[in-house]
């Protein structure tokens, strides 16, 4: 068995001319295709590329080669790549077909012809386009309010994809450019949520992925509602707070913590709490304190359960009159789940 050895690239022109001289005649060349400069052919990755070469001189000898060596010499295939074959729709065609094109196929290809008069060449430059693909993106992140956040989104593709960041809210801002990094300085609670990274080029539809940003912040009382109560009836005080993580609630009266007992019932869900008196008596009238706390802080609001006709306002207000030791004790208790 004879083993074929690819010649050195520097010797390819000489080898090719010698090879062409040995080839049998038969394939002509259309000289008009060989008088112009290099043609560019653009093909999407995975598609089939056809590099055209048409001849007209019946006494010519033809070969295809690229930077790696000789691909075809006449009808003799030198390349070991099964994706490569000749395309002959008619007797004068000597085109090269490359199936399932990949990025390593990109480069210059030469159709070289030895005519009766002089050698001629036609060059084709194959450009391989690649759809955008996000290769790396930040994981979901949780930070405290006021921190600096950097999100990363890296993508591959040809041409180079353009990266666009967008905050997925009704009024979310779009951050556009070729930067892979999105920096948020001093992040606020309003900037929490999902961020979308979009990588786009002209080859196909964009590749899109998301990152969730959670912003922790201390509790803020958003609503505290006092209530009018008639003796012998049921009455409730309600308190709502905004916080991440969700706050824990406690109720106090006269610096004494209240538990669900003796006709009092406390119900707390995420972000809100209520204190219900099942059967109001004279001793239940007065000031109550709702305390909301999470690992970042504690706040409180003062509410009033008042008699019918009292001149006291209906809406409670945030109060700083509660002793600091009580707030500190409440926070420690909530954090330790006492």
Curated annotation (Swiss-Prot):
Belongs to the immunoglobulin superfamily. IgLON family. SUPFAM superfamilies: Immunoglobulin. This is Limbic system-associated membrane protein. It is a lipid-anchor; GPI-anchor. One of its GO terms (biological process) is cell adhesion. Residues 1-28 form the signal peptide. Residues 316-338 form a propeptide. GO terms for cellular component: cytosol; extracellular region; plasma membrane; side of membrane. Disulfide bonds join 53-111, 153-197, 239-290. Glycans are attached at residues 40, 66, 136, 148, 279, 287, 300, 315. The keyword RNA-binding does not apply. It is found in: Cell membrane. Mediates selective neuronal growth and axon targeting. Contributes to the guidance of developing axons and remodeling of mature circuits in the limbic system. Essential for normal growth of the hippocampal mossy fiber projection. Residues 29-122, 132-214, 219-304 form the Ig-like C2-type domain. Keywords: Cell adhesion, Cell membrane, Disulfide bond, Glycoprotein, GPI-anchor, Immunoglobulin domain, Lipoprotein, Membrane, Phosphoprotein, Repeat, Signal. Expressed on limbic neurons and fiber tracts as well as in single layers of the superior colliculus, spinal cord and cerebellum. A lipid is attached at residue 315 (GPI-anchor amidated asparagine). It comes from the Eukaryota. The modification Phosphotyrosine is found at residue 94. Its main location: membrane. It comes from Homo sapiens. PROSITE patterns: IG_LIKE (PS50835).
